Every structure is written in structure tokens, then in C-alpha cells.
A protein has these predicted regions:
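N-terminal amphipathic/basic-hydrophobic helices that include classical n-h-c signal peptides
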Residues: 1-16
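Bulky hydrophobic segments
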Residues: 13-164, 169-171, 187-215
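Membrane-interface transmembrane-helix boundary segments in multi-pass integral membrane proteins
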Residues: 175-188
Length: 215
């Protein structure tokens, strides 16, 4: 019983640790992971060596905006996972299928999921949108992110041609409906995130200490 009590206290301490500390830990941790993948990309001379610049910039940008967007460490962690999942393309994951579905679907859906979670929290705490319009705004912004990404990819494909990574056209991009499918997948992820957050807020608002950790 004494040991169980100590374990419980440790878990509580971890859950309620200052969010600023967690965000710093997550920033450092995923920076190290991205650097490690970058070394491999340089070693094999993969085009993913250029993606490192954009991924690290995104990670740092979100971190520096953490106060304005009320960034939660759990959401920041999920974003870091997305960045790593994308960069795992250096191992040719985008040309493979997992659970019968192409890798590109999982990554785009996951990005929509994470983005919607972050936006939902921001709008709940500081955003001007309320009610059902909040959900529409989240979907619109996620699709906006997706559209920007597709235009960025298109510009890279036109200027640089075939290759790997976000700047080139390669595995996962050859379908003539790739843009529409990517945006659809982002939308799927966003809708799932909205459903999860809405359901949690409606049915489990009193859970402690997890409520404090998640919110």
C-alpha cells in the first residue's frame, strides 16, 4: 500500500508539472530526434535533408507562440510526433501501406487531427468563435493549412521536379487526385478531433487529475 501510494504521488506530480517545463522538454526531445534523422538523411543524401529546415522551423514557431495559442504540452507532443512521422519518409514509408492503407493517408489524417485539437483548445480559451461556428472555423483553418501545404508542394514539384520530401514530387504524390485526397484526409482527422474534444468536454468534464492534465 505504501509503494502504491508513492507511485500514485509520482504520477500526480508528473501530470501536474508546470506546462512550461513540459513544453521545453518536448521541444528539446523532438529537436534531438529530428537532428538524428537529419544526420541519416545527409548520410544517404536524401532530399529529406531539406525538410529538416521546415520541420524544425514549424516546431520552434509553435513553441514561441505557445502563450498566445495556449499551447498544451500534450498537443505539442502530438505535433512533434507528426513531424517525426513525416520525416520517416526518408525510410521510404510513403511508398508503403500500413493496415491496408497507404502511409500518406495516416500522416495527413493525423495532421488534421493534431491541428484541430490545438485550434479547439485555443478557441475555447482565447478565440473569438463560439458555438457551432467554432467548429466551422476549425475545419476551415485546417483545410487552409492543407491548401497551403498543397500549393507549397506544387511549387516545389514545378521548380524542382521528382524526388523525395515536401519540395519534390515522389511517392504518395503521383495520383492525379492527390491534392483532393490529401485535403480530404486532413478533413477526416479534423472531424475526428472535434468529435473527441466535444465528447470529452460533454461527458467527462470532472475527471481528476486527468482533466487538469488534458486541459
Amino acid at each position: 500500500m505504501v509503494l502504491a501510494g508513492k507511485i500514485y504521488n509520482v504520477v500526480l506530480f508528473i501530470l501536474v508539472m508546470k506546462r512550461e517545463v513540459w513544453n521545453r522538454i518536448i521541444l528539446v526531445g523532438f529537436t534531438i530526434i529530428l537532428i538524428a534523422i537529419e544526420f541519416y538523411s545527409l548520410k544517404v543524401d536524401s532530399h529529406y535533408k531539406w525538410d529538416f529546415v521546415f520541420l524544425l522551423a514549424l516546431l520552434l514557431a509553435v513553441y514561441f507562440l505557445r502563450d498566445k495559442i495556449k499551447l498544451h504540452p500534450f498537443h505539442f507532443f502530438l505535433l512533434g510526433v507528426f513531424l517525426v512521422l513525416h520525416n520517416l519518409g526518408v525510410f521510404e514509408t510513403y511508398s508503403k501501406f500500413y493496415f491496408g492503407i497507404e502511409y500518406d493517408f495516416w500522416v495527413h489524417s493525423y495532421f488534421g487531427f493534431v491541428s484541430a485539437l490545438m485550434l479547439y483548445r485555443t478557441y475555447n480559451l482565447v478565440g473569438p468563435y463560439k458555438g457551432w461556428f467554432k467548429y466551422l472555423a476549425i475545419v476551415a483553418i485546417v483545410l487552409g493549412f492543407s491548401a497551403f501545404h498543397e500549393l507549397f508542394e506544387y511549387a516545389g514539384a514545378v521548380l524542382l521536379g521528382e524526388g523525395e520530401g515536401v519540395l519534390f514530387i515522389g511517392a504518395g504524390d503521383i495520383d492525379e487526385w492527390d491534392t483532393q485526397k490529401d485535403m480530404r484526409n486532413n478533413l477526416i482527422g479534423a472531424l475526428i478531433a472535434i468529435g473527441v474534444y466535444w465528447g470529452y468536454n460533454k461527458f467527462y468534464p470532472k475527471i481528476k487529475p486527468l482533466h487538469k492534465f488534458i486541459h
